[in-house]
Amino acid sequence: MGPAYAAIMRPINEATWNRAERLRQGRDALKKLFSVYSRRELVEMKSKRFTVPGVAAPITKEQALGVLLNSGNASNLQRLMSGQKLTRDQVQAIIDTLDERDVRFAQSVWDYFETFRKESFDLEESLTGVRPEAVKAQPVQTRFGMLRGGYYPVAYDTDLSALPADQDKVGTQTSGR
């Protein structure tokens, strides 16, 4: 295998192996994070709805966890509250529905995302020449004590959740079809 292999194929093969290894590590880490829940609980988390005093529509545990995870920094909390038309009291009421295992899970998710900060910032800086500004964690009060908070990627729910503001979106997005 000559210079062409060394220049072309070796880097491709190494990148492919590195990608496969990173995917395996990520899968294992996520499996460990979610291992606090049974399969049945994970299924019910997405489908079983409950009411929260002061919140108009019933929600799922998955949505309640999303509220908690988005409360871990000021910018996500603001987006959550303005996008879903929730007050701080409603956010707190939703967080208060979660059990101790749920709040420990949320902190472990924030901690997991923190493990990528240096590498992702280094990559962004190498690609753009600008180092991203870190999102500052903000403490979150739960019934089981204060969580440190942390970064959680903002993702807009394309399935339109059942939180009150989404009821308006459903009407808006389906009225032109």
How should these model regions be labeled?
Residues 1-177:
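Non-transmembrane, interaction-prone alpha-helical and coil segments associated with secretion
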